């Protein structure tokens, strides 16, 4: 992604050791934040002819059915095993039904803005908003419930997924040089102590 060099040392260390070493700061003001600061919604950043939303649906769903003449890009239906709840959800594209499955920014964009993304270039913010590392297809209601919460204010109901979820948040924040708030770091350490050897995801 433009202008960002993923940290190499962190990829072999545990998430717990990495978060324990982080210096914390309070959230910056939300002043200046808009979704537009992160570029067009669901851009085709990897230039594969398919927008990011459909790329993630393709990655996370099974039994995909595609819209004709879209070169297996536009997903019209499929099955999601929601990582946040463990529920199986049948996705059907439509004005209302599409909301059943939403694409979650693991580190919410407004949260990222308040923890350092306001310092990034426009291209770096666009990369963050479309990075598969920071995106998951999830149950729509839980995505709405999460809002812009961090690990201190919201965690997936499915406890067995919390280590993966928190590890992914850490990986995103390290990659884009975002900081952690004290309550967020405390919550992450508490979760990762249940899986102390877990490494951070890279994709």
Annotate each PLM feature:
Residues 25-28, 63-66, 121-122, 162-163:
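Short secondary-structure boundary micro-motifs
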Residues 29-102, 106-107:
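Secreted/periplasmic proteins that engage bacterial cell-wall peptidoglycan
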Residues 16, 32, 39, 63, ...:
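A near-ubiquitous, low-amplitude feature marking generic local secondary-structure context
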Residues 6-9, 23, 28, 46-47, ...:
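Homeobox/homeodomain signature
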